[in-house]
Curated annotation (Swiss-Prot):
PANTHER family: UPF0756 MEMBRANE PROTEIN YEAL. The keyword Transmembrane applies. Keywords: Cell membrane, Membrane, Transmembrane, Transmembrane helix. Coiled coil: none annotated. It is found in: Cell membrane. The chain crosses the membrane at residues 5-25, 53-73, 79-99, 121-141. One of its GO terms (cellular component) is plasma membrane. Its main location: membrane. It comes from Geobacillus kaustophilus (strain HTA426). The keyword Acetylation does not apply. This is UPF0756 membrane protein GK2737.
Length: 151
């Protein structure tokens, strides 16, 4: 058994122990790709485009209530009358700006990707986190690195 499969099986066990369906599904899909022999063709595409696909799917999910008519201009204007909505608005802007720098860091430093991926795997499997961490984590890492370089 090769190292990637063994590593994935170990992570699959963690996924089952943590009862994390997203992690389990992701690993089963990756193992299936390897099992049928498409890994050389498919995995590089997933690796290079997967984050963008994921962001697109999340964006679709966030915009679905607008498309369904559940959220309209009235709800938007009404929500901006509360302090909580303004905090959410500022948080959304802040996180999007942080994540932008994360894309830059992941593209320029492949070694960072391994550490961030492992941190995300630990958070997802052990603490029931959600796997949006690598992009935000990379953005935070980028910001901290730039601050350290500045001083």
């Amino acid at each position: 058994m090769n190292e990637p499969v063994l590593f994935l099986l170990l992570l699959l066990a963690l996924g089952f122990l943590a009862k994390n369906k997203s992690l389990i599904v992701a690993i089963v899909v990756l193992l299936a790709i390897k099992l049928v022999g498409l890994d050389q063709k498919v995995l590089p595409i997933i690796q290079s485009k997967g984050i963008n696909w994921g962001v697109t799917v999340i964006t679709i999910a966030v915009l679905a209530p607008i498309a369904s008519g559940e959220i309209g201009f009235r709800q938007l204007v009404g929500s901006l009358q509360s302090l909580s909505a303004w905090v959410a608005l500022a948080s959304g802007i802040f996180v999007a700006l942080i994540a932008k720098n994360g894309v830059t860091l992941l593209a320029n430093d492949p070694h960072m990707t391994a550490a961030l991926a492992f941190g995300t795997i630990l958070a997802v499997s052990l603490f029931h986190g959600v796997a949006v961490g690598p992009l935000i984590g990379a953005g935070i890492a980028y910001t901290v690195i730039k601050m350290v370089e500045y001083f």
